Amino acid sequence: MWTADEIALLCYEHYGIRLPKKGKPEPNHEWTLLAAVVKIQSPADQDCDTPDKPAQVTKEVVSMGTGTKCIGQSKMRKSGDILNDSHAEVIARRNFQRYLLHQLQLAATLKEDSIFVPGTQKGLWKLRRDLFFVFFSSHTPCGDASIIPMLEFEDQPCCPVIRDWASSSSVEASSNLEAPGNERKCEDLDSPVTKKMRLEPMTAAREVTNGATHHQSFGKQESGPISPGINSCNLTVEGLAAVTRIAPGSAKVIDVYRTGAKCVPGEAGDSRKPGAAFHQVGLLRVKPGRGDRTRSMSCSDKMARWNVLGCQGALLMHFLEEPIYLSAVVIGKCPYSQEAMQRALTGRRQNVSALPKGFGVQELKILQSDLLFEQSRCAVQAKRADSPGRLVPCGAAISWSAVPEQPLDVTANGFPQGTTKKTIGSLQARSQISKVELLRSFQKLLSRIARDKWPDSLRVQKLDTYQDYKEAASSYQEAWSTLRKQAFGSWIRNPPDYHQFK
């Protein structure tokens, strides 16, 4: 068995030991966010797991990312060589895809032990039954999960800075995509000092056991179950507003933490009224940019999507019998609401049905650790005291993957740190987790497998571009189409010409 604190500590130690100083925040002046994927291996003998002597599991960080920023729409490139979204959760997921690609190569070439075993169909693989994956984030995902109720008479885990949220200028700035410095506002700490934020009490349920139960819903939801019908398409404005006011017992919700993520076109939109009614919940949102709007969906939305389609993406689905799902999400110590997390990650797609074989709406354990990330905004703000200058998000993003070749990558503005205008477009100016490099790694995997052992989806037609390979993953595309039709109809998609590179 494992606990949320064990997962957090493992990730914090990995960050301190395995990630370089380059790309980390400047002490007392910058902060960042951390995310990772942890592989959990259950003991071979499940019978040894008893209340008196719990079974020990093997835990290993297989991907990690830091970062707080996105590029604006005007900086996007059709060559696939820039990272549009450098939020930590997205960086960690892409590094996880690198790890999966490497493990598929090990399996297909029979060189070393792999996390994959042969599936029942030709050319397909599936995850070993004794393995599962836990996603860790030092902070609540931006977007819907960060619309957190503030209750009276409860302790606030981070020191706020006084600001009058009732003033129209402050309200406007908090929801404006173009507001400077708004790259990552998972929550807004600049709330009135008199307000108290709800921190979910930790329960004995923090300890997680192995085995067949690891896909069951988990975590204390004090405010009652989310309605099965909640998703961004079918909630009325009144229903959305009501959800924000749900509170345990007789506690009064006096406000909500703001998210900088803005509602996508086609959604109901925020009321922006003072207090708890400021946001509508359950809506799809895009990440804020600095002067230039982004096309990057919020991390809450992306993680909800991964929970139906898997973390592997379309390319890797060619080789997999079923998607690679996360079994649990662990959040570090920060402003947090169990209700908001469950609503954002699982509640909005509960009624999705008629998915293709292998795909399904997964139940997900959602837990919080008591351990604070030392380079989070809260931690740095508490330490810096009277240090001169503003506290700002770190401009760099660090990527790490458990692969033998070039496991580390440090980027800024979507390119490897140090890239100049003259070098943009060259091989040296590509992150290892850019779309074009992930495509190159996928093609490298194909080159090492005899063509007659390729899965049918790759042999029936000639595939050339990134778009070709994605569209040929028919089961994945069918699942994605179903999810959009039934829950995420307003999802922003990039035009096809951004995927025509090869």
Swiss-Prot record:
Keyword terms: Hydrolase, Metal-binding, Phosphoprotein, tRNA processing, Zinc
GO biological process, one term: tRNA processing
Single GO term (MF): RNA binding
Ranges for domain A to I editase: 63-501
Catalytic residues identified in the record: 89
Swiss-Prot/TrEMBL catalytic activity: adenosine(37) in tRNA(Ala) + H2O + H(+) = inosine(37) in tRNA(Ala) + NH4(+)
Binding-site residues for 1D-myo-inositol hexakisphosphate, renumbered to this chain: 93-94, 302, 305, 435, 470
Entry annotated with the keyword Phosphoprotein: yes
Modification sites for Phosphoserine: 191
Function: Specifically deaminates adenosine-37 to inosine in tRNA-Ala.
Record family assignment: Belongs to the ADAT1 family.
Entry protein name: tRNA-specific adenosine deaminase 1
